[in-house]
């Protein structure tokens, strides 16, 4: 590469970015913009079909190139492109394409964007399933939320998913981590070298200048992509347990639930008589968040950090969540406000 040539970056996405559908999509766009700010030349590829709310990357000057799984055409594509950096979006993309990149572009820097530790999220999901199988009627999940790092490691380390994800991190030169809690878990429990991990949280370009006053707001709000398992579990928990308790205290309360790709099973929960409103996709998440009095995020499992809670902060909207929801969202051991 000549001294004047622009750095070429290939991003291999698990899906095409949809910043208005998920926090992960928004974070990817933030990363892409940071690359563009460096004057780098970007190519975005994905084996996924384009979603309904896909961002137009070409409008930003990013080349879009669909690719296929298990197809030698990728070998020719990456060899001709000759990227200086390859960013894999989630470890599954590294598994599929990393060895091909190593073979045809051995000098390329390989970077993994984890979004969140999937092995942590899945281990927590399995623990929740185990608790629910016991048939308890209690809604106190404090023991589930109060897992020490050593306990988290015990649950994670025995899974094939953890072995695959950790292996992908080792194969890459650097991994972008959105959560400091997950960095500590990898370093202290899995004994990964800290030099392999780089903290890359959600990035904000501009802060709002003011908030709508409480008197101009109405209703409670919950928001999240219905395809994301932690969000769907939160919807069911709200419907069956949390919301009835709120309505006992506030009979006139109304809850508006927004999310991309509303499935029939979610639409079937719509019940205005109970104040439970399935509102489908919000074109402008900050607009609906700014109009709400409270943001509910009763997440019983998950990982990473939560874009919906950051949006609530930006809008001056109080949020109510669980320790899983607030994880890595506050510093210096401060309690969630």
Model-predicted segments: where are they?
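Conserved catalytic-core segment of nucleotide-activated headgroup transferases in glycan assembly
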Residues: 27, 170, 174-177, 181, ...
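Short acidic alpha-helix that forms the nucleotide-activated donor recognition element
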Residues: 75-81, 167-170, 283-292, 314
């Amino acid at each position: 590469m000549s001294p004047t040539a622009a750095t070429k970056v290939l991003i291999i996405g698990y899906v095409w970015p949809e910043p208005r559908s998920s926090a992960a999509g928004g974070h990817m766009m933030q990363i892409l913009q940071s690359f563009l700010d460096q004057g780098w030349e970007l190519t975005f590829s994905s084996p996924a079909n384009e979603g309904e709310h896909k961002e137009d990357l070409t409008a930003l000057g990013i080349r879009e190139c669909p690719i296929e799984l298990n197809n030698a055409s990728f070998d020719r594509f990456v060899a001709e492109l000759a990227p200086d950096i390859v960013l894999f979006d989630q470890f599954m993309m590294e598994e599929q394409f990393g060895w091909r990149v190593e073979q045809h572009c051995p000098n390329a820097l390989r970077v993994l964007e984890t979004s969140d530790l999937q092995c942590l999220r899945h281990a927590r999901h399995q623990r929740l399933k185990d608790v629910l199988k016991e048939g308890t009627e209690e809604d106190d999940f404090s023991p589930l939320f109060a897992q020490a790092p050593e306990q988290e490691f015990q649950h994670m380390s025995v899974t094939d998913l953890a072995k695959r994800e950790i292996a992908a991190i080792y194969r890459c030169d650097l991994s972008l981590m959105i959560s400091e809690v997950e960095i500590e878990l990898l370093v202290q429990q899995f004994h990964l070298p800290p030099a392999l991990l780089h903290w890359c949280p959600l990035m904000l370009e501009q802060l709002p200048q003011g908030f709508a006053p409480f008197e101009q707001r109405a209703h409670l709000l919950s928001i999240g992509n219905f395809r994301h398992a932690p969000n769907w579990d939160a919807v069911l928990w709200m419907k069956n347990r949390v919301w009835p308790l709120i309505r006992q205290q506030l009979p006139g309360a109304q809850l508006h639930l927004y999310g991309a790709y509303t499935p029939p099973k979610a639409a079937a929960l719509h019940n205005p008589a109970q104040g439970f409103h399935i509102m489908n996709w919000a074109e402008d998440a900050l607009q609906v968040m700014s109009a709400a009095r409270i943001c509910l995020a009763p997440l019983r499992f998950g990982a990473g950090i939560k874009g919906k809670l950051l949006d609530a902060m930006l809008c001056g909207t109080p949020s109510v969540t669980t320790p899983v929801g607030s994880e890595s969202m506050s510093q210096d051991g401060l309690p969630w406000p």
